[in-house]
Structures are given as structure tokens and as C-alpha cells.
Amino acid sequence: DGKVDQYGFACGMNTSDIGAMQILNAYYYSALWQNGGQVYNDDLKSVSFADEAGKEAVTWLKGLTSYMNEDFMSLSWSDAFSNVFGAGKAAFGITRSSQTDGTTFAETYPDLNWNFVTSLKNKDFGTFGATDCLTLMSACEDKDLAMDFIKYVTGSEFMTAYHAKCPGAALTESEPYVGDEKMEKIYTEDKDKWHGIQVGPCGTQILNQLAADFQGIMSGETSVDKGLKEAEDYANGLLDEYWANK
């Protein structure tokens, strides 16, 4: 019919339904880490995402736009995966992983022939892995009790029972894998391919600005150099002010 509806990469850069930083989780961090980059310098006093590794990573992502669905700026990342990749209209897509994807995808996308990689590799592997923590606060009235509770709920016995009902990544080496056989390698063979985000000062402001400039680069509103420079200047200004008061 003359209509192009087959693409190389299913992508969605609209953040109206999930927040700006989700596009960093889905697309940006992996490219940055795989090219040897990081968000912050090691001393956390300045950012490094606009160095040569960072520029190369974003330039590579920008180059993929010619292989994306034309409406990538108006779709969310999840809509792009379900409506483009899930419909069999793209060769590659990115979504959150789950230990039950083998089961749920068979129900949601019954005609889709799919497989997955946990991470691509350039200079290194690297894919976003969400990390949460239980924190013992200095104001806690009974620190021993709180620590005992943390150890209990993160221990193998409790988490084995919990994950039997709600499949998720094991927290300890002694906890057995629970989930689809197809997805097991994410948590066994590929566990060294995950990265967590660096914890640094002013993180929310820095990453929200970076996400906005990343959108601008991908949409063509600004160049790679200008977009990253704007995000870098904003971030380093915040960090200078933060550290001046320490």
C-alpha cells in the first residue's frame, strides 16, 4: 500500500505519562555505559556525560532516528514497545525485563517470534538495572531492631517465599531462581552486565535537565554538542554551589 510500517528500532521519547527520567533509563544510560562513560566524575564534584565518550554515545543514538518509527517523539517508551515491536513492526525494542516475560509475552503477543539480549556491547556491556535500598536512619530509636528487620526481609527464607508469589530478582546467592526458563540468564549469566545509577549530589535536577536536553537532541531541536553543553553547565553550576556549602 506504499505505507512504511516496518522499522529497525521501536522507540518512544514522550515522557508525559511516566516522567522525564524514564527515557534515560530506557535508552540513554545503556549507550553511555557501553561507550565507557558515566554521569558524574569519580569525585562527584562535576559531571562527565559531556566528554568524548558521552558525545559519541548520544551521536550514535541520534543516528538511529532514521531507523525508528516516525512518531517516536509522541509515543512513550512502553507504547512504542507494545504498539510497534509487539505488533511485529520493528526488529528491535527496549522494555523492562521480568522473570515472567516468557509467559506474559506469549499471552500479550501470541504471534510474535522474539528473543532478547540483556545488553549490547561497545567498549563494555551496560544496561540499566533499577536498585532500591532499605536505609537505617540516624534518628531511628532502636537501630538493632531495625537492622534485624532489614536482614529478615532481605534474607533468603523470606524472599524465597515472597518471590514464589511475586517473581523478582533474587537478593542473595542462596535464594533460588523463580521464573520462566527463558529469562533465567538475566539473573545468572548476565548479572555483571547491569549497572546502577551513580548516587551523586543534586541528582534529580541534573538528570531531569539531561533528559530534557536529550529529548531536544533526538527531536532535532538542538545539536549533540549544544544539548550536552547546556546540561553540563547546568549540572556543574548546581554542584559548585552544593560543594561550596560543605
Please tell me what each predicted stretch does.
Residues 1-16, 155-166, 238-246:
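Bilobed periplasmic-binding protein-like "clamshell/Venus-flytrap" ligand-binding domains
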Residues 1-47, 90:
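Extracytoplasmic/periplasmic solute-binding protein
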Residues 35, 42-75, 119:
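Glycine-centered hinge/linker elements that transmit conformational signals in sensory
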Residues 59, 63-67, 99, 105-168, ...:
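Extracytoplasmic/periplasmic substrate-recognition and gating elements
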Residues 72-87:
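Short helix-initiation/N-cap motifs at beta->coil->alpha
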Residues 91-96:
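Paired acidic/hydrophobic, glycine-rich loop segments that form the ligand-binding mouth/hinge
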Residues 110, 114-117, 163-216, 241-246:
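Long, aromatic- and glycine/proline-rich binding clefts that accommodate carbohydrate-like moieties
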